[in-house]
């Protein structure tokens, strides 16, 4: 676009107007493409939010959202780690095989939750980037 814009700057009269119209048409096409990407990203964000809520409910927690942002992230993740610590304390100084399985299952759920949060954040950031480009 910059080269076309610089070329248009050197022109005058009807030639300049024609070149500016070409630039405008190209920009409108780009905006439509970005808007289509944004719409698709919004669809993925809904899916990511469902996945995030599913992973959270597996840990008996829930997130609240404010304009797409997770508004209770700190408190919720603190409660998740507190649950893990409470489970560890309940086992005492030694952990048997059954207790280790419980801990591993909890750790797996926590990892799934963290992955879901990361995916949600990436999609939300993509939408913000597309908004800035539009």
What residues fall within each predicted segment?
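Short, charge-rich amphipathic alpha-helices with coiled-coil/heptad character
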Residues: 1-33
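A structural signal for alpha-helical segments
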Residues: 22, 29, 65-68, 72, ...
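Long amphipathic alpha-helical coiled-coil segments
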Residues: 27-42, 47, 86-122
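Short acidic DE-rich linear segments
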Residues: 1-3, 125-134
């Amino acid at each position: 676009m910059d080269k076309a814009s610089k070329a248009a700057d050197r022109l005058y009269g009807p030639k300049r107007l024609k070149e500016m119209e070409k630039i405008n048409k190209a920009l409108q096409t780009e905006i439509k493409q970005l808007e289509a990407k944004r719409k698709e990203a919004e669809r993925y964000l809904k899916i990511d939010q469902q996945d995030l809520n599913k992973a959270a409910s597996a840990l008996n927690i829930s997130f609240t959202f404010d304009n797409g942002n997770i508004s209770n992230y700190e408190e919720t993740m603190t409660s998740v780690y507190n649950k893990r610590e409470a489970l560890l304390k309940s086992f005492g100084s030694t952990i048997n095989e059954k207790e280790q399985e419980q801990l591993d299952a909890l750790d797996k759920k926590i990892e799934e939750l963290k992955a879901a949060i990361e995916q949600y954040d990436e999609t939300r950031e993509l939408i913000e980037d597309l908004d800035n480009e539009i």
